Amino acid sequence: MSHASPDAARSRIVLASNNPGKLREFAALFSTAGIDIVPQGELGVSEADEPHATFVENALAKARHASRATGLPAVADDSGLCVPALLGAPGVYSARYAQRAGREKSDAANNAYLVEQLREVADRRAYYYCVLALVRHADDPEPLIAEGRWAGEIVDAPRGAHGFGYDPHFFVPALGATAAELDPAAKNAASHRALALKALVARLGEIR
């Protein structure tokens, strides 16, 4: 009679992203629940379209796409930076903020465009927002949904070498640092994605 190795009992969930920063955050938190995160690129899955106007619709579309392509449970996030003074922009277009204005698609271009848009704006309040969607299968009628919000403000000069996206310009008064100045452990304890992930991980028993 054969005996399964301890690793054989570990579940696998496809991450509907190939972003290295996201992969590190997801892998660290899901590992505490005995779950291995596999980026969709390793399984030959292409990026899904994100045509929707809300974070939750985009997250669900990405999760269903990855699950349909692999036959495995899948998790996706749709996250963005929201600036109330800019009517919630960049919002769902955070990754393509500068590109939508005819500029290149890059973190540097996005950050430069954001600072430019806020040049004459006194209210620099902002928040990172994250919605996570986990589907057991592609047509799951009851996906697990979790969300997280991280409050801060936008600063003109970039600070810090960690993180990605808008992190160098996202200052968190409660921590006295930008998101990019936080080491990964500190960010994983405080960020919007961390809050959403912790809420989702707490419910993982529902998919066993």
Swiss-Prot record:
It comes from the Bacteria. The active site is at 78 (proton acceptor). It is an enzyme of class 3 (hydrolase). GO terms for molecular function: dITP diphosphatase activity; ITP diphosphatase activity; metal ion binding; nucleotide binding; ribonucleoside triphosphate phosphatase activity; XTP diphosphatase activity. GO terms for cellular component: cytosol. Substrate binds at residues 17-22, 79, 164-167, 187, 192-193. It catalyses: XTP + H2O = XMP + diphosphate + H(+); dITP + H2O = dIMP + diphosphate + H(+); ITP + H2O = IMP + diphosphate + H(+). Its cofactor is Mg(2+). Binds 1 Mg(2+) ion per subunit. SUPFAM superfamilies: ITPase-like. Mg(2+) binds at residues 49, 78. GO terms for biological process: nucleotide metabolic process; purine nucleoside triphosphate catabolic process. Keywords: Hydrolase, Magnesium, Metal-binding, Nucleotide metabolism, Nucleotide-binding. Its EC number is 3.6.1.66. The keyword Magnesium applies. InterPro entries: dITP/XTP_pyrophosphatase, ITPase-like_fam, RdgB/HAM1. Homodimer. NCBIfam families: RdgB/HAM1 family non-canonical purine NTP pyrophosphatase. Pyrophosphatase that catalyzes the hydrolysis of nucleoside triphosphates to their monophosphate derivatives, with a high preference for the non-canonical purine nucleotides XTP (xanthosine triphosphate), dITP (deoxyinosine triphosphate) and ITP. Seems to function as a house-cleaning enzyme that removes non-canonical purine nucleotides from the nucleotide pool, thus preventing their incorporation into DNA/RNA and avoiding chromosomal lesions. Belongs to the HAM1 NTPase family. PANTHER family: INOSINE TRIPHOSPHATE PYROPHOSPHATASE, INOSINE TRIPHOSPHATE PYROPHOSPHATASE/HAM1 PROTEIN. This is dITP/XTP pyrophosphatase. It comes from Burkholderia pseudomallei (strain K96243).
